[in-house]
């Protein structure tokens, strides 16, 4: 970055997809709150889109965690006779509408970009204006597991097919980008059943398109410990949030000790008077 140049945003936050592992994003939010740091823009895919939007709407980390603690999968999806997907996710959309404080992107406290996949045209699509609940549902709609979501006549599915870790969406807009990748590892052991095979297949698909984005972050938060949790694990919300918090804290401390990047961090946080030591 040339001296004296400024980008549109100082600090951006990019949140990957990863199913229930996305609860780790809440732990990152908690650390940001404790440090008095607020991103200027957020981008998220799938679980990252859901968690990021709740945070962008002004919900505190602990409040977001309470929304999901003690929930059952049936509260978000309903098994159906398979047509376009095994589960109907209308319940998920109603959950979002019930808990989110706003109805549109324009009402959010922090600009938010939701990444989904345009199934009809075979490309990634970025939502950042208009109604917000359906784009979130689209971004989280894993193909075959959930029905595609139709928005303005176009079928959308999980954004992870093309862009599971959407750092590059905001890279050129921000001085500093913090990236949280909750999908970096999968165990070599797995069950030979349709669920495990599908989960593993999607994991490899999502992992394959994250390599470049991992190197695009100024600060990358990820750990193999995320791999201990399954895609639809709603029983360990507290544990996953804690892993996210501990990983973020450890990463932040390493980051500020790197002399070549410390100046970037300070530059991004100057207006907030919040520098981690």
Please give the residue ranges for each predicted region.
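Patatin-like phospholipase
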Residues: 1-45, 53-277
